[in-house]
From Swiss-Prot:
It comes from the Bacteria. Residues 2-135 form the Toprim domain. This is DNA topoisomerase 3. The gene is topB. It catalyses: ATP-independent breakage of single-stranded DNA, followed by passage and rejoining. It is an enzyme of class 5 (isomerase). Belongs to the type IA topoisomerase family. Mg(2+) binds at E8, D104. Residues 152-580 form the Topo IA-type catalytic domain. GO terms for cellular component: cytoplasmic replication fork. NCBIfam families: PRK07726.1 (NF005829), topB (TIGR01056). One of its GO terms (biological process) is DNA recombination. Keywords: DNA-binding, Isomerase, Magnesium, Metal-binding, Topoisomerase.
């Protein structure tokens, strides 16, 4: 009798097979003497669509809503049906005695496996592999500590409740809004409050009125001492009066006080913090960062589990620090690593905190030594960010002295603060020295003459627009960006971790861009006209982050066995009735402000112009008609002058490529340039890209080489 291991992806399945020395490869699984490992392809089973409950639901009608199934159904995803049949046959195999779930260790990973097992009707015992990295050592250690599957039943119930609630609310709210206003509109418990967060910031900026204010400083022996102000001076004349009073007067040093301080590195990365830092440093979007992390985790085995919300490690990991450091010797930080390897580490260090680690600890390097030349540029950047933060947290704190000098001139007090570094500590990693040593020796009681008096003009600044990095952080802490009028709700949001999860926020932002509710211009995220109207037409409960925070709090209670999942689902059904009825009874109107005079070639209705991340397209205004046409899109063709990516306008022989520098090429000119560049041949990479993306061959720069390609 053998144990069947169910992994989430083929790559992880192969890693497990390698760690357990399983040699016999078959179609869809790998077998050994004791184990068989098979895999899903992400989800193999999903919630049924409305039309799979009743064919009449294929047509979207307001009268049919709400659609509330008595019992939720699941279906096998047609694209992955072949693999599902393989997994099913293995689960039901008489030679299989038990199932070991080895999907991602978290709520969604549990759902992937349990939906498959439930669909098959599994009755065999279940065990759980729970690991935070897929290195050979981690897998082998994990198999020595397999848990009983029953210990994760509550986790599954929470995942299932989340999935069913999102279906019930999302399907009905979206269909209600779309059919009521005859427009492609989408609602969701996370995406709609996210639009509201961006809208609130946008309003704050639009209504902001800058105000001038003034400060005064005196210069003593080359050092500026600032006037201690009880208020912000908006009238320059007030400071001019003070200037007149102290001019040519003698001052006195009242106090010279030094205070030693220390600062620690920023916490180890969780996913949101890493996505924010990657955007700040490299302008990498959250989705791009997550995908890169997945490669580092699954393919290269260089980092631990990415989808974590924790900034800490568990104290039992203290003995693994040295081997992780040895792995980083392969990087440019090797000199700092050598200094650390000789040290001993204690679980009393600030990075260890069992209470602040739930499913997974912070993202840190594994013990696998990186082959830098095998990493892509993005993978290298993200790995180095993680290694850098890991090392900073192991290094000594930054020690410095804050020297404060208080002075008096007439009836006015002045202050000078200087930071004097004592020990760079973790700052030595990047040599972050921005302060200087105070060379003048001020003494208490010392008299001085003022060399110069200056009045400085300042202006209040509006808050900045969100970018993809800062919006993630705002979703994690929405209570800081929306006026909730109740401290209780702010506490709920803080406790529940905001709206969405570390694993879903990047997808939500991407979806809002794709549905044209948000747009990003020069890194500034703004709400589109469509996004504003979605907020105006939506029931207020769905635009506030409070609701989704309350849901998340209940899901966390379900995970802990402290709340009934069926009660939660019934609450969601009641809520859905309320939302649908509000939409039905609304007398508001939706206005397409981007309607064009171009007729849809399919149904004849006028099309609307929408912005996408890579350009613009025309979409039929009728949500039942799926016709789309590209107006312009960014291509991979580079400008011969400035090397930037060119934008394609139009299609076919009439297409034109334009660059921001002003360079323009017709399709025939582009074809000739690419033929000359490639000698009429096309690379395997370009061929694969064409096959995967199904680009229009008329507007592919390599079309002459591709046109004879048989697919």
């Amino acid at each position: 009798m053998k144990s069947l291991i169910l992994a989430e992806k083929p790559s992880v399945g192969r890693d497990i097979a390698n760690a357990l020395n399983l040699q016999q490869k078959s179609n869809g699984y790998i077998e050994g003497k004791q184990y068989i490992v098979t895999w899903a392809l992400g989800h193999l089973v999903t919630n049924a669509t409305p039309e799979q409950y009743n064919p009449s639901y294929k047509e979207w009608n307001l009268e049919d809503l709400p659609i509330i199934p008595k019992k939720m159904k699941t279906v096998v995803i047609s694209k992955t049906n072949r693999q599902f049949k393989i997994v099913k046959s293995l689960i039901l195999d008489k030679n299989v005695k038990e199932i070991i779930i080895a999907t991602d260790a978290g709520r969604e990973g549990e759902l992937v496996a349990r939906l498959i097992l439930d669909k098959v009707g599994n009755k065999k015992p279940i065990k759980r592999l729970w690991i935070s990295s897929v290195t050979k050592k981690a897998i082998q250690e994990g198999f020595k500590q397999l848990k009983n599957g029953n210990a994760y039943q509550n986790l599954y119930e929470a995942a299932l409740a989340r999935s069913e609630a999102d279906w019930i609310v999302g399907i009905n709210a979206t269909r209600a809004l779309t059919t009521k206003y005859d427009a492609q509109l989408s609602l969701g418990r996370v995406q709609t409050p996210t639009i509201q967060i961006v809208k609130s910031r946008q309003d704050e900026i639009n209504y902001f009125k800058p105000e001038k204010y003034y400060t005064l400083s005196i210069n003593v022996d080359g050092y500026d001492l600032n006037l201690k102000q009880q208020k912000r001076y908006k009238d320059k004349k007030e400071l001019e009066l003070i200037e007149h009073k102290i001019k040519h007067q003698e001052g006195k040093i009242l106090e010279v006080k030094g205070k030693n301080k220390k600062s620690y590195a920023q916490p180890l990365f969780n996913l949101t913090d890493l996505q924010q830092e990657a955007y700040k440093r490299y302008k990498m979007g959250p989705k791009e960062t997550l995908n890169t992390l997945q490669h580092l985790y699954e393919r290269h085995k260089l980092v631990t589990y990415p989808r974590t919300d924790s900034n800490y490690l568990t104290d039992d990991m203290v003995d693994t620090i040295q081997e992780r450091l040895r792995a980083i010797l392969a990087t440019d930080y090797k000199s700092h690593v050598r200094d650390l390897i000789s040290e001993s580490f204690s679980s009393k260090m600030h990075i260890f905190n069992n209470q602040k680690v739930s499913d997974h600890h912070a993202i840190i390097p594994t013990e696998v030594r990186p082959s830098i030349e095998q990493l892509s540029q993005r993978e290298f950047k993200i790995y180095m960010l993680i290694a850098e933060r890991f090392l900073e947290n192991l290094m000594n704190p930054y020690l410095y002295e804050v020297l404060t000098i208080h002075a008096q001139l007439k009836d006015y007090n002045f202050v000078l603060k200087e930071i004097i570094p004592k020990q760079l500590g973790y700052k030595a990693l990047k040599d972050q020295t921005s302060s200087h040593t105070l060379t003048h020796s001020f003494k208490e009681g010392q008299l001085f003459k003022v060399h110069r008096i200056e009045i400085h003009e300042h202006e209040t600044k509006a808050p900045e627009y969100f970018n993809e990095g800062s919006l993630l952080k705002a979703m994690e802490n929405p209570q800081n960006h929306i006026d909730l009028n109740d401290k209780k709700y702010a506490k709920t949001l803080k406790h529940s971790g905001g709206i969405g999860t570390v694993a879903t926020r990047a997808d939500i932002i991407e979806k809002l861009f794709n549905m044209n509710a948000l747009e990003s211009r020069d890194g500034k995220i703004k709400v589109t006209s469509k996004g504003k109207q979605i907020l105006e037409l939506s029931p207020s409960e769905l635009t506030s982050p409070i609701l989704t925070a309350q849901w998340e709090e209940k899901l966390m209670l379900i995970e802990k066995g402290k709340y009934n999942s069926q009660k939660f689902i019934q609450e969601m059904k009641n809520f859905t009735f309320k939302v649908v009825n509000k939409i039905k009874s609304s007398e508001q109107k939706y206005k397409h402000d981007n309607l064009t005079t171009t007729e849809c070639p399919t149904c004849g209705k006028f099309m609307i112009k929408v912005k996408t991340k890579n350009g613009q397209m025309l979409v039929c205004q009728d949500p039942k008609c799926k016709t789309k046409k590209n107006i312009q899109r960014k291509t991979n063709a580079r400008c011969p002058n400035c090397k930037k990516k060119m934008t394609l306008f139009g299609k076919g022989k009439e297409a034109v490529y334009r660059c921001v520098c002003g360079h323009t090429e017709t399709q025939s000119q582009m074809d000739k340039r690419m033929r000359d560049k490639t000698n009429g041949k096309v690379s395997r990479k370009e061929m694969k890209k064409y096959i995967n993306k199904k680009e229009e061959i008329d507007n592919n720069p390599f079309k002459d080489a591709l046109k004879n390609l048989k697919l």
